[in-house]
Amino acid sequence: MRAQWMLAPLLALLLVATNADVAAQERVIQVTAERFKFTPGVIELKVGVPVVLELTTLDRKHGFQVPDLKIDEVIEPGKITRVRIVPDKAATYDFHCTVFCGSGHEEMAGQIVVSP
């Protein structure tokens, strides 16, 4: 019984260390929306690697939709919209703006390319 009580703190420490490792491995990619384009226009990811997309806009409200990944966000000026994803298969996913932002809006698109 005494050994179990001594083992519990060690297991808790291991759990905390494991969570810290996962957070350290999470990539952060900044995506900027402005006047009919996203930067970067192509986002390259790896299967199984957690990523946080930090979405910002330099001019006005925009949308960021990736239908095949079930992502549909609004990007507000002066705010950061964070989207966490862990790609589970290699594929190319199209994204586009869903908030009409003027003539040229229909060209505001890009791709997420996930490799093995």
Please describe what each predicted stretch is.
Residues A8-A17:
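Bacterial N-terminal signal peptides
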Residues E44-R82:
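N-terminal, post-signal-peptide region of Sec/Tat-exported proteins
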Residues T18-A24:
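Sec/Tat signal peptide C-region and signal peptidase I cleavage site
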Residues I29-V31, I43, I71-E73, V83-I85, ...:
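Generic detection of short hydrophobic beta-strand segments and adjacent strand-loop junctions
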Residues M1-P9:
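Bacterial N-terminal signal peptides that target proteins for export
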Residues Q25-P50:
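N-terminal edge beta-strand
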Residues A33-R35, V49, T56-D59, D68-K70, ...:
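A mature extracytoplasmic/lumenal domain signature
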Residues A23, I75-P116:
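Extracellular/periplasmic metallocenter environments
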